[in-house]
Amino acid sequence: MGKEKLILAYSGGLDTSVAIAWLKKDYDVIAVCMDVGEGKDLDFIHDKALTIGAIESYILDVKDEFAEHFVLPALQAHAMYEQKYPLVSALSRPIIAQKLVEMAHQTGATTIAHGCTGKGNDQVRFEVAIAALDPELKVIAPVREWKWHREEEITFAKANGVPIPADLDNPYSIDQNLWGRANECGVLENPWNQAPEEAFGITKSPEEAPDCAEYIDITFQNGKPIAINNQEMTLADLILSLNEIAGKHGIGRIDHVENRLVGIKSREIYECPAAMVLLAAHKEIEDLTLVREVSHFKPILENELSNLIYNALWFSPATKAIIAYVKETQKVVNGTTKVKLYKGSAQVVARHSSNSLYDENLATYTAADSFDQDAAVGFIKLWGLPTQVNAQVNKG
């Protein structure tokens, strides 16, 4: 009787490479690597998995699907965990889990493995998502089971013919996709240490950024960014392009001590140039086009959605319901913003929309004023009536 098939979420790094060598004794390992826009050498990763002992190796380009179905709902909801983190890694885990489950069904695998430790959020995100999509699949976490130190991993790798990555001395743990880059470990673990320049990878230091500001126009249609400077492109390409444009101006650096799902605090360095520009630009179009009641209520749901996504509940009914509400609000979010990029700052300096609720004739203090000021007297009387009655009854 042959071995059971196992789908491994493969990154090409030391942990998941050692996992292939460890798992192949009991399973037929099928390595699956998802391209979510991190810019890795995917051909090398594909071949490396086979060299170590995977029976099959797949590279899945999911950039467009990731952008359209995961990043876009988060953008439209201004999803920022603890009002600071645009959910870079948290957004990619659901689509990775989804594709792992699809590959398990396609290949007849009964088990999925991931390379997460027992200390981070991602183990929860993967396993909760997989259980939501197919509760019959078994999930194992080799790295969590080993509890090995890095030196023990290297010893095992050398003994089992696993190639040692060239950047093994890099003290940082980095995760990247088209929505941004996350960095932790090394000197960053001490929150009193300023992050050294070497900790950043996709943004220039604001001090080294160009001395001249750059202005860009971003066009939105139904809440979706569709063009930069009138050049239309897919959402994935637009985000990747904006990462380069804004990154060279030092935009999107975030230094955050966050509350992890597993109960500890963690210091993270994020670089999210496109995300920070798009979040600011999108909010400005909403400010023009949404009625006051929606503008005031939507942030309550935005905060809840941010927590749901961070806390591994992308596939929960609550997440689905909030995303549906947000999508309904986006029908009028059409227009263009002009954004000034300069030394770490992205400032929206102009905006217009065919759905704008801003009426200059109502807002102006010039002779063109069309606001009926006589109506204010009755409005004030009725608006303040409950307060007035309370004061009369309760003496203030």
Curated annotation (Swiss-Prot):
Enumerate the UniProt keywords alphabetically: Amino-acid biosynthesis, Arginine biosynthesis, ATP-binding, Cytoplasm, Ligase, Nucleotide-binding
Single GO term (MF):
ATP binding
Write out the pathway annotation from the protein's UniProt entry. Amino-acid biosynthesis; L-arginine biosynthesis; L-arginine from L-ornithine and carbamoyl phosphate: step 2/3
EC number annotated for this UniProt entry: 6.3.4.5
Entry keyword annotation includes Ligase: yes
Amino-acid positions noted as binding L-aspartate in the UniProt annotation, renumbered to this chain? T117, N121, D122
UniProt cross-references to InterPro entries, sorted A to Z: Arginosuc_syn_C, Arginosuc_syn_N, Arginosuc_synth, Arginosuc_synth_CS, Arginosuc_synth_type_1_subfam, AS_cat/multimer_dom_body, Rossmann-like_a/b/a_fold
> One GO CC term of this entry?
cytoplasm
Residues involved in ATP binding: A9, Y10, S11, G12, G13, L14, D15, T16, S17, G115
Catalyzed reactions per annotation? L-citrulline + L-aspartate + ATP = 2-(N(omega)-L-arginino)succinate + AMP + diphosphate + H(+)
* Coiled-coil segments on the chain, per record: none
Q: Where is the signal peptide?
A: none
Q: Where in the cell is it found?
A: Cytoplasm
Task: Kindly state a single biological-process term from the GO annotations of this entry.
Answer: argininosuccinate metabolic process
* Keyword ATP-binding attributed: yes
Which branch of life, at top level? Bacteria
Binding-site positions, L-citrulline: Y85, N121, R125, S173, E258, Y270
Q: Which CDD domains match?
A: ASS
What is annotated about its quaternary structure and interactions? Homotetramer.
Q: Under what name is this protein listed?
A: Argininosuccinate synthase
Q: Which organism is it from?
A: Streptococcus agalactiae serotype V (strain ATCC BAA-611 / 2603 V/R)
**Where is the organism placed in the taxonomic lineage, from the top?**
Bacteria, Bacillati, Bacillota, Bacilli, Lactobacillales
